[in-house]
Regions:
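Short, small-residue-biased leader/transition segments that mark boundaries at the very start
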Residues: 1-5
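ATP/NTP phosphate-donor binding region
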Residues: 9-88
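Charged helix-capping and loop-helix junction motifs
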Residues: 38-41, 72-76, 108-110, 280-286, ...
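Long, hydrophobic/aromatic-enriched structural stretches that serve as scaffold segments
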Residues: 83-108
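Short, acidic/small-residue loops that bind anionic groups at enzyme active sites
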Residues: 107-137, 143-151, 327
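Conserved anion/nucleotide-ligand pocket segment
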Residues: 145-231
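Oxyanion-binding "anion nests"
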Residues: 225-277
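ATP/nucleoside-binding phosphotransfer catalytic cores, i.e., glycine-rich phosphate-binding loops
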Residues: 279, 285-288, 294, 298-363
Length: 363
């Protein structure tokens, strides 16, 4: 793979301002283009407008599931075009999926795209399969946000965005500080009905009983943030989901090498598939094999969606990591469970479990 995209010093995009235009891209699933998502478009655009932001749907973003599944090149083109367009200040992923790795050859062999990322860094946010896009940008030296996306957050079908997630999104807008992440006082079950008829219904919510939990290790630690969705990281390293995914990701050096993991804080969270404990154990074990737990300064683990396998996951983490000195903080509000905060790749996080806060800053 070419050295052109060897990691530079991190570049940080400017925050969004009133009047800015944001692009919506479908880099994974094409569901935003399906009729059953039309109400989401309406809700999301309205909420962005309330922030004084103009929405631009990239030309291929609404072409639907089948078309985008068959045309990774079209998905990649949207991302490139968004970077080439000076009128676009930020890029919001529509939603995750499971095959955005197919975009890598079209982007990481395109000098124009790489150049545009270096010369005009833009705010980029999303989670889940978007982990792959984040790691690509990390490799290119652009700091991005593991946080809200269009369908799940801006287009949340409750009357309002979920307050904790809303605050995370607002941190992308100039003038809003987002220095401290604390545990959300409530958590929400995943919806079973996302259709138009359910618009205006509230999610089932629960009082948070656990807060951030220190499973082991010292109470205070720090490091730059690096990580993503655990299943995405596992898929990069195996042929389990797609036969060619491991080879494609290896070709472009997508999974950070061991030097890169040194003194980082690894953040990981499980997806909506709610992996059974045996699968979770495999996913943690592969990171252990890679040596990640030997060199990072600590680990943040997201709350499992619907608190699935809550205690089993905790026990597996401690057992497989097998290093009692490594700090592991569990049940942090990021990723697939709602509500969600935002974590910035490459930002310095200072975790203080005496006060149960995570402070993040760019430096």
């Amino acid at each position: 793979a070419s050295d052109v995209y060897k990691r530079q010093v991190m570049k940080y995009a400017e925050k969004l301002r009133k009047g800015d235009k944001v692009a919506i891209v479908s880099l994974s699933s094409g569901m935003l283009g399906e009729a059953f998502c039309s109400h989401n478009i309406e809700i999301g655009v309205k909420r962005l407008r309330e922030y004084g932001l103009e929405t631009s749907f990239m030309p291929n973003s609404l072409k639907g599931i089948e078309y985008l599944k068959a045309n990774p090149k079209a998905r990649a083109k949207d991302l490139k075009d968004a970077f080439m367009d000076d009128s676009i200040a930020g890029i919001i992923c529509a939603i995750g999926g499971d095959d955005t790795y197919r975009l890598l050859p079209y982007l990481l062999e395109d000098e124009e795209f790489i150049d545009a990322v270096h010369k005009s860094p833009k705010l980029f946010t999303g989670f889940s399969d978007t982990t792959i896009n984040h790691l690509m940008f990390y490799k290119l030296g652009l700091s991005t946000y593991y946080g809200p996306n269009f369908i799940c957050d801006l287009a949340e079908i409750s009357d309002e965005m979920l307050p904790y997630s809303k605050k995370a999104f607002e941190s992308y807008i100039e003038g809003n500080e987002y220095r401290e992440i604390t545990s959300s006082e409530i958590w929400y079950q995943e919806r079973t009905d996302f259709l138009k008829e359910a618009v205006g219904t509230e999610r089932i919510s629960h009082r948070e009983e656990h807060g951030f939990e220190l499973l082991q290790g010292k109470e205070c630690f720090e490091g730059r943030l690096l990580g993503g969705c655990l299943e995405s990281l596992y898929d990069i390293l195996t042929t389990t989901r797609y036969e060619d995914e491991k080879a494609v990701c290896e070709k472009y050096g997508l999974f950070p090498d061991i030097e890169e993991w040194k003194e980082k804080i690894l953040f990981i969270e499980t997806c909506e598939e709610k992996p059974v404990p045996e699968q979770f154990e495999k996913e943690i074990a592969i990171l252990k094999e890679k040596g990640v737990f030997d060199v990072v300064s600590g680990v943040l683990v997201g709350k499992p969606q619907d608190e699935a396998y809550y205690d089993e996951y905790k026990n597996i983490l401690v057992k497989v990591v097998n290093n009692p000195d490594l700090p592991i903080v569990y049940n942090v509000n990021f990723g697939h469970a709602t509500p969600r905060c935002t974590l910035q790749y490459g930002a310095v996080a200072r975790v203080d479990m005496k006060r149960k806060i995570i402070k993040c800053e760019v430096m």
